UniProtKB/Swiss-Prot annotation:
PROSITE patterns: HP
Core as annotated region, ranges: 1-731
Residues with the Phosphotyrosine modification: Y85, Y758
Name this protein carries in UniProt: Advillin
Tissue specificity of this protein: Expressed in dorsal root ganglion (DRG) neurons and superior cervical ganglia (SCG). Expressed in podocytes.
CDD domains attached to this UniProt entry: gelsolin_S1_like, gelsolin_S2_like, gelsolin_S3_like, gelsolin_S4_like, gelsolin_S5_like, gelsolin_S6_like
Top-level taxon of origin: Eukaryota
Subunit annotation: Associates (via C-terminus) with actin. Interacts with F-actin. Interacts with SCARF1; the interaction occurs in embryonic dorsal root ganglions at 18 dpc and induces neurite-like outgrowth. Interacts with PLCE1. Interacts with ACTR2 and ACTR3; associates with the ARP2/3 complex.
Gene assigned in the entry: Avil
Amino acid sequence: MSLSSAFRTVTNDPGIITWRIEKMELVLVPLSAHGNFYEGDCYIILSTRRVGSLLSQNIHFWIGKDSSQDEQSCAAIYTTQLDDYLGGSPVQHREVQYHESDTFRGYFKRGIIYKKGGVASGMKHVETNTYDVKRLLHVKGKRNIRATEVEMSWDSFNQGDVFLLDLGMVIIQWNGPESNSGERLKAMLLAKDIRDRERGGRAEIGVIEGDKEAASPELMTVLQNTLGRRSIIKPAVPDEVTDQQQKSTIMLYHVSDTTGQLSVTEVATRPLVQELLNHDDCYILDQSGTKIYVWKGKGATKVEKQAAMSKALDFIKMKGYPSSTNVETVNDGAESAMFKQLFQKWSVKDQTTGLGKTFSIGKIAKIFQDKFDVTLLHTKPEVAAQERMVDDGNGKVEVWRIENLELVPVEYQWHGFFYGGDCYLVLYTYDVNGKPCYILYIWQGRHASQDELAASAYQAVEVDQQFGGAPVQVRVSMGKEPRHFMAIFKGKLVIYEGGTSRKGNVEPDPPVRLFQIHGNDKSNTKAVEVSASASSLNSNDVFLLWTQAEHYLWYGKGSSGDERAMAKELAELLCDGDADTVAEGQEPPEFWDLLGGKAPYANDKRLQQETLDIQVRLFECSNKTGRFLVTEVTDFTQDDLSPGDVMLLDTWDQVFLWIGAEANATEKEGALSTAQEYLVTHPSGRDPDTPILIIKQGFEPPTFTGWFLAWDPHIWSEGKSYEQLKNELGDATAIVRITTDMKNATLSLNSSESGPKYYPVEVLLKSQDQELPEDVDPTKKENYLSERDFVSVFGITRGQFVSLPGWKQLQLKKEAGLF
């Protein structure tokens, strides 16, 4: 097959294209069979997504556990050719059965099914309406599940997983006693998907709870008739998981094969910086053997680029890692989000921005504007998300200080003054369509005691409970105040390095104080106390030098007019009047005397603000096993927020922890520590003081919902639970009738020398009794139809037909010409 012919289906339209290697040729897999993989084969999958106006493509070649070496080599070659065909920009992935990447599994929301056999044994990907099936599927996983065909025996079962007995016209789900509701729900959705996609909706589904088998005697009879007498079920088998701590260890190697042998040289370990990557070379990034990345520089030769995957496999062999280790190759300038976030920061070069921080979300620049239309924040939550603002800060503000481990209200005139020796709670109330909404900020001073830090967290829970769990909780570390926090104090936020604001404080104020004032409007301005020495100055900012008798407002050469105006307002608040303005370079001698004399300070021209390339990511978090585990959800939607889970949304400069209404108590109580551990163990070496926002299901602010396309606030009230879906399946009567018919047909097949007592439809349609076969009862012609013909003639299964009243059966037989 020519390449142009093999890739003729490739377009820039979003979606998934799957090919199977058949006799060393690429053969397209029908859409209805996507997610089904034969264990004896190799596949190539192309995923195309649009992020704004940009195209993102990923090529995966999948290796079945029983595939031949020739097929694996062929798949690798076709992957390289497809990459060339698409201009060398796609990210390439090597996927091995049972060890697929989160990205790969994320394509198949209903799950992956591993099927026995392959091309060599004549197995084909068939279209819908196939009922000649008899298999047992072992279903594992909770979010992106995998179902493997296993031996039709009770020996295949265990207490912790879900199993589907698929008999074509009947699918029976057996839930292990130790499986959770999420796994059961996903398995049921898989059973429904098999019914609808492969059986045209014409199959019956039944469910057995493994710890309540006596409640489903009819279904258990079907299982035992098929699998034999029930034996003792084996204990649960723990899933193979990699904790976040293991993933946090990364190593960068330079790769060379100039001597004819693979040579790898260690370059650096965590934290990695982007500047380590030379555009003329190739590198391997090793994530503790859990995943291998190969980075191909733009200046590397074509031969070097094409050999990248084989180099990775040689590296895996050299390190003694399992052959199933996941490999991802990325191109210089087209790196995946997962690769970029292994670095301390990843900048987009040659892009100019203003003074504010800029993020490139999916490579589309999102600039934090100084001014924005507040009315857009709730009608367009994506604006709120990008701006990190729920409103303009004009809501109601209440402030408490932790004093003797209790909450003490802070008087209004002291709102906006925060001391490094204290902890505070700030409750912000705003209105959305007549409904009050709340944000609870927990501000923790750098010099606060451990008891006060613990008390602030405890008191936050108390306040949260007073409002029915509605507040969004935001942990704020001193100096890391988010924009909305600054906005509620209207440009009059002052942070003292130490001390306390509590009454009766006997600690004297220092004779000289120096404040660095940063910000250019009322939503982003604050004054932060720094060491009162000349070395603290910076030419790009404004500083206030304060003493009891004198006040100087020092304008650095690089400060803007807006910054100076905001600093002047703040200085008037701190000085109870005007301060003397001093331009950099025109300082009087007493100015330097107060700072202890002149000293070198940062006086370089303001650096152009770099553009950070950030991909917002969603993770499922768990620490209930004692190990901290995170699983990424790729191409996430609101549907991925399951009420039974704790989810983490990482927007880089802040982290949201979303707590589902049905999450277990342990994970709810440990929410903050979960988010903190995520930051500490992040491979890139994240700032542990990154703001953390804790959000409960049903109380999501627009700064959170804006990251999800078409957020639906009613999705959980309208969505169906596992129990509701289970109840919709009906009783077991139809299943028993169908399986009885199937058993009788099998018995007649085994006992009759003349073959099964089924006849073609055209034979049974004959109207004269004498023309019918001798063994056909003319009043019950439907009994002589095969299962497939029965569904074809009546449009329903045999079990559904039998459950109808007699007059309805008669009517259908007349309409079909079988009466």
